[in-house]
């Protein structure tokens, strides 16, 4: 009987040992970081109902799937991050494009320098907005290319420089990497006031999406590169946010490339915006207003002056409704425009995930 008791005790101790080993392995597996721990998946889907009166007097309305955006961010290593973003926009082509894809090598919490390579919109301009429609500065100057960027940060100061081979090139020259830009930004928070601002330079503003479209067939045969500069800033306090931006070509284009009133154009775009958020019937509601303008930007299809207002209501987490009204004024007849005004009213449903 004693032998049976000893045998049972031995088997019990063996079982307990195996259980402890299994528990230890489970704890180790739980503690070991998984690749999926560093993966973030998200995006947005927007449906818009619009009514537009063009400068020609034509009145149109439509319901569109305005935008679908899907992104995957990963952090496979503490010194490596990646970002891939797909985009569908209602531009008449019904296509899905690779909007952004880049890798960032660095960890600014431990070392101030970093390297970024891939395709994305370069650091030329600040385009944050609480309106539904992008500011005119973005329509004129956003530049999305495959590039290599080197940056440095220190106490809220960010300095970046980048190189790329754009869609535009000089007449008679080979297709090569000869376009570049630089930006300097500063941001922080003090006494409940958050602020951010920056300046940017680009040696060929013609490579922005808006100006490349305006150049048309001349995009690969321009006479010379026209550099551009921009400045932007925003400040937030007590639920109020103020924003502003100014962007300009530093020289005039040739009249045969981008013209204004019979001469070479020197396009300018600017915007001012104010937004205030407060609870309305228990829902966070943002009221925004903007005034924007351009100079010598008729060839880009931009208005001379724009006034607008928008209201965005966060219905539930990740879902909002925005109502926006924009009033645009065209360039005068003597400048090549119609001298007329137009408007666009938009109701947007946006779901983020």
Locations of the language-model features?
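Outer membrane beta-barrel
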Residues: 30-168, 174-181, 185-201, 235, ...
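Active-site environment of divalent metal-dependent phosphoester hydrolases
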Residues: 168-169, 207
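N-terminal periplasmic/intermembrane-space "pro-region" immediately following the signal or transit peptide
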Residues: 1-46
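Compositionally biased, intrinsically disordered low-complexity segments enriched
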Residues: 3-6, 77, 294
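Outer-membrane beta-barrel pore domains
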Residues: 53-59, 101-108, 191-353
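Compositionally biased regions
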Residues: 8, 15, 24, 184, ...
């Amino acid at each position: 009987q004693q032998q049976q008791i000893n045998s049972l005790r031995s088997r019990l101790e063996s079982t307990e040992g195996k259980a402890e080993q299994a528990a230890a392995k489970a704890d180790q597996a739980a503690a070991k970081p998984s690749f999926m721990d560093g993966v973030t998946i998200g995006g947005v889907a927007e449906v818009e109902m619009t009514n537009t009166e063009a400068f020609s007097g034509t009145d149109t309305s439509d319901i569109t799937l305005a935008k679908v955006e899907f992104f995957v961010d990963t952090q496979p290593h503490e010194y490596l991050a990646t970002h891939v973003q797909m985009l569908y926009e209602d531009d008449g082509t019904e296509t899905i494009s690779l909007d952004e894809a880049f890798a960032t090598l660095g960890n600014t919490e431990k070392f101030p320098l970093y390297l970024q390579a891939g395709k994305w919109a370069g650091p030329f301009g600040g385009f944050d907005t609480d309106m539904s429609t992008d500011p005119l500065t973005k329509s004129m100057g956003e530049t999305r290319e495959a590039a290599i960027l080197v940056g440095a940060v220190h106490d809220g100061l960010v300095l970046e420089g980048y190189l790329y081979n754009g869609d535009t090139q000089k007449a008679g020259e080979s297709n090569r990497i000869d376009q570049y830009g630089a930006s300097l930004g500063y941001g922080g928070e003090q006494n409940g006031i958050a602020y951010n601002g920056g300046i940017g330079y680009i040696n060929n503003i013609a490579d922005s999406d808006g100006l490349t479209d305006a150049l048309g067939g001349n995009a690969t045969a321009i006479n010379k590169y026209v550099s551009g500069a921009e400045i932007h800033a925003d400040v937030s306090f007590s639920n109020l946010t103020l924003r502003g931006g100014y962007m300009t070509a530093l020289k005039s284009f040739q009249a045969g490339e981008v013209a204004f009133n019979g001469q070479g154009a020197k396009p300018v775009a600017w915007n001012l915006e104010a937004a205030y958020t407060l609870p309305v019937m228990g829902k966070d509601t943002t009221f925004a207003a903007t005034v924007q303008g351009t100079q010598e930007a008729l060839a880009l299809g931009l208005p001379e002056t724009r006034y607008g207002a928008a209201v965005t209501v966060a219905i539930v987490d990740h879902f909002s409704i925005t109502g926006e009204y924009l009033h645009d004024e065209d360039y005068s007849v003597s400048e090549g425009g119609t001298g007329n005004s137009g408007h666009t009213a938009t109701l947007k449903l946006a779901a983020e995930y």
